[in-house]
Amino acid sequence: MSLKKTDRIIDELADRLFIVEGEVTDLLTSETMQNLNANMQTTTGAIAVGSALVGQIGSAALASFAASDEGIEVSDFAIEITDQNNQKHYFKGCFPVVIFKKGDMVKVIAEPLSGQNKYAYASAIIDQKNNYIWTSQEVVKGRIQHRITSMKFGLIIGCFSILVFCLFAFFDDNWISFIFSQPVLASFFICLFISLFIGWRIGASFDEQSIELEAILKKLGFNKPNQMNLQNFALSDLSWKNKEKDFIHERWKDYTYRIDLAKQYDEEKYGKK
């Protein structure tokens, strides 16, 4: 997919996205359903706990939460937001972790679902008090960042292959002249070029996730969404960089990002001077 075509898709998605701010007044997650079932409650009984959401999300969709065996890696959730005008909004989504809870003031970046007017898909949720943002699985890097990361990895593999070749060539009496001969040097450059190209293509395979992230960041007013890597602003990464002595690694910190620091970085590096 060409970059221009991808840019157009991102613009269209950003236009479809809308933002709702308010209080979390109801919440149902995969973990909630699984815990209720573990306590010998039926699925129907478990859904009754989230009855405020049943009429909007639908019992069939909520029942799938309890049937899912992926709750360890990701968590489906349904959420009710009540805005300042006391109007209720309903969303359904799936994040690696669900840390927000009832009573939190949040900002939801959502996409309308085709043929569905009762609820929308939550692309990202921001905790307004702590400036935390959560997104779907792998929705953390823009297109350029994904490509750069993959190309670096490809370059490492290419250099390792060349090093192994040189180690074997070392056993030849004329290994220096052999390695620096034009055919061998040309082969090295071709190997590195192919490694970079493969890395570029691997990075491009994440375009679907990158498109979603870039649309979200564009909606939030970022200057260069395609250059952004939210992983640099994950709580765990920030604690490691700041060398916090009392830091304890917890999984939720790997998937919770500081949107305020990301915005500050974007403004300082790519904002108008």
Would you name each region that the model predicts?
Residues L3-E70, M105-K107, G142-I144:
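Structural detector for short beta-strands of small beta-barrel domains
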Residues D76-Q87:
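Short, basic/aromatic beta-hairpin or loop at an interaction surface
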Residues E111-G154:
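OB-fold/S1-family single-stranded nucleic acid-binding modules
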